[in-house]
From Swiss-Prot:
Name under which the protein is recorded: Omega-3 fatty acid desaturase, endoplasmic reticulum
Gene Ontology CC annotation, any one: endoplasmic reticulum membrane
Domains (record comment): The histidine box domains may contain the active site and/or be involved in metal ion binding.
Membrane-spanning intervals of the chain: 52-72, 213-233, 236-256
Gene assigned in the entry: FAD3
Length: 379
């Protein structure tokens, strides 16, 4: 009798009983090691030259766009420039994000140097964000300890003011949240990505935060100097507007990787949470023609479970892992060239996903039907 392939084993046995009614909050019938073992060994290999080639490609593209915009200096061209350049700023961010994870190369020095250059150029404090993002990965799906786009417990939700809810749930304001998050974090959390004494950081991490804050300050000072040299309007056209598009991309993508799926997904507390169960609540997305431009950031599930895998191996790693993941992997909707369908997912989530219960170790988003009816009189 021939042996069954791994996909047959998992598809026919492990998930047969869940074929008609699948509970995404149920403990998975596999371990993290089982997923790791089916991912080809070469997917874990980091090629610094290949990683640097993406940096060179993106930087050349950004510089070329700046040159074209300055040469044409046309209001007819600027909206197109802003859209494309803001998209490229986001691509630059993703490469710096890979440096922070250590998936860029095996050299910590190379990762940190490249990461600082890329992130400082788009006003991101490299180490400050790297450390908080590491916290996010280590606590994904945990209501109490996750770091970004965390659901508010009902008591906190009822406590925050109307203006906070308006900015948090009323499009387009959530798509402009990132700079404020860097400064003040999310509702219910304190600290800053620029302050080495923030609650975000351990004492041994303070020197790294200082370095990144200094690099950010140098870039901010350079931008101010360029404003005096070339005018604030010119700098807004060349840098400011693309920066806003980049921020919108970042908030759009990071939100949809943890929200907006067609069926509500669980969040955890206490003993019900585990690294594996939290990671399985993340969602892959198809961004159409932007998949390659954004370095396959949409392959998010495997990235969250194994952030050390380089982005150029994530598609292959995901394909290899899917037979093990079974229904715990949610196949993303196929996109046309432009992922317009994701705007619908975002809008639906903003209207429905407002808070979670204060109690219970497995919770789901609940809806406040009166969220925008009227502002309180004391506001």
């Amino acid at each position: 009798m021939g042996s069954l392939g791994i996909s047959e084993i998992y598809d026919k046995n492990s998930f047969n009983e869940m074929e008609f009614e699948f509970d995404p909050s149920a403990p998975p019938p596999f371990r993290l090691a089982e997923i790791r073992n089916v991912i080809p060994k070469h997917c874990w290999v980091k090629d610094p030259l290949r990683s640097l080639s993406y940096v060179v490609r993106d930087v050349i593209f950004v510089a070329t766009l700046i040159g074209i915009a300055i040469h044409l200096d046309s209001w007819l061209f600027y909206p197109l420039y802003w859209a494309i350049q803001g998209t490229m700023f986001w691509a630059i961010f993703v490469l710096g994000h890979d440096c922070g994870h250590g998936s860029f190369s095996d050299s910590q020095l190379l990762n940190n140097v490249v990461g600082h250059i890329l992130h400082s150029a788009i006003l991101v404090p490299y180490h400050g964000w790297r450390i908080s993002h590491k916290t996010h990965h280590q606590n994904h799906g945990n209501v109490e300890t996750d770091e970004s786009w965390v659901p508010m417990p009902e008591k906190l939700y009822n406590k925050v003011g109307y203006s906070t809810k308006f900015l948090r749930y009323k499009i387009p304001f959530p798509l402009l949240a990132y700079p404020m998050y860097l400064m003040k974090r999310s509702p219910g959390k304190s600290g800053s990505h620029f302050n080495p004494y923030s609650d975000l950081f351990q004492p041994h991490e303070r020197k790294y935060v200082v370095t990144s804050t200094l690099c950010w300050t140098v870039m901010a000072a350079l931008l101010l100097y360029l404003c005096t040299a070339f005018g604030s309007l010119q700098m807004f056209k060349i840098y400011g507007a693309p920066y806003l598009i980049f921020v919108m991309w970042l908030d759009f993508v990071t939100y949809l990787h943890h929200h907006g799926y067609e069926k509500k997904l669980p969040w955890y507390r206490g003993k019900e949470w585990s690294y594996l169960r939290g990671g399985l609540t993340t969602v892959d997305r198809d961004y159409g023609l932007f998949n390659n431009i954004h370095h396959d950031i949409g392959t998010h599930v495997i990235h969250h479970l194994f952030p050390q895998i380089p982005h150029y191996h994530l598609r292959e790693a995901t394909k290899a892992a899917k037979p093990v993941l079974g229904k715990y992997y949610r196949e993303p909707k196929k996109s046309g060239p432009i992922p317009f369908h994701l705007v619908k997912d975002l809008t639906r989530s903003m209207k429905q996903d407002h808070y979670v219960s204060d109690s219970g170790e497995i919770v789901f988003y609940q809806t406040d039907p009166h969220i925008f009816r009227s502002a309180p009189k004391d506001e």
